């Protein structure tokens, strides 16, 4: 009874706690049922052993001035759905952006459209550059 009274008296704390629990559940659920892989820079380098790997940069053209990965395709996020039909669904695909947020969204879209081997670069181009891996300008 005292616990319920405490929760009623501390509505901000209760609401925050409830929101955190919901976010935790959503995060655990999304990771378990995600159809694509999230790879770090080492995982991305390993994927590059595949000569047929398709690397997709979903950043806008102006963002590429900071550099880009060798042999990538620049398909800005807003154009991916329109250009999906030009990609081979059977090949490994590595998607990256600046920080990993947009690439996760695009990797999810690709995997839901029957692309079988999709990976998103965790930390995006920022992580790649921070790891001092080769970039093109």
Task: Give the location of each predicted region.
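Rhodanese-like catalytic fold shared by cysteine-dependent sulfurtransferases
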Residues: 1-41, 50, 61-92, 102-137
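Structural scaffold elements adjacent to functional motifs in cytosolic proteins
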Residues: 55-57
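Short, surface-exposed ligand- or partner-binding patches at beta-edge/loop junctions that are enriched
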Residues: 96
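The conserved Walker
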Residues: 99
């Amino acid at each position: 009874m005292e616990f319920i009274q405490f929760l009623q008296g501390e509505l901000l704390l209760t609401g925050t706690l409830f929101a955190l629990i919901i976010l935790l559940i959503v995060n655990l659920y999304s990771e378990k049922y995600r159809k694509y892989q999230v790879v770090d820079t080492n995982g991305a380098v390993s994927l590059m052993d595949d000569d047929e790997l398709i690397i997709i940069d979903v950043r806008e053209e102006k963002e590429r001035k900071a550099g880009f990965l060798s042999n990538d395709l620049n398909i800005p996020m807003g154009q991916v759905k329109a250009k999906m039909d030009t990609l081979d669904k059977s090949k490994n695909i590595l998607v990256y952006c600046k920080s990993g947020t947009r690439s996760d969204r695009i990797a999810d879209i690709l995997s839901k459209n029957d692309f079988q081997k999709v990976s998103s670069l965790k930390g995006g181009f920022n992580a790649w550059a921070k790891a001092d891996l080769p970039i093109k300008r």
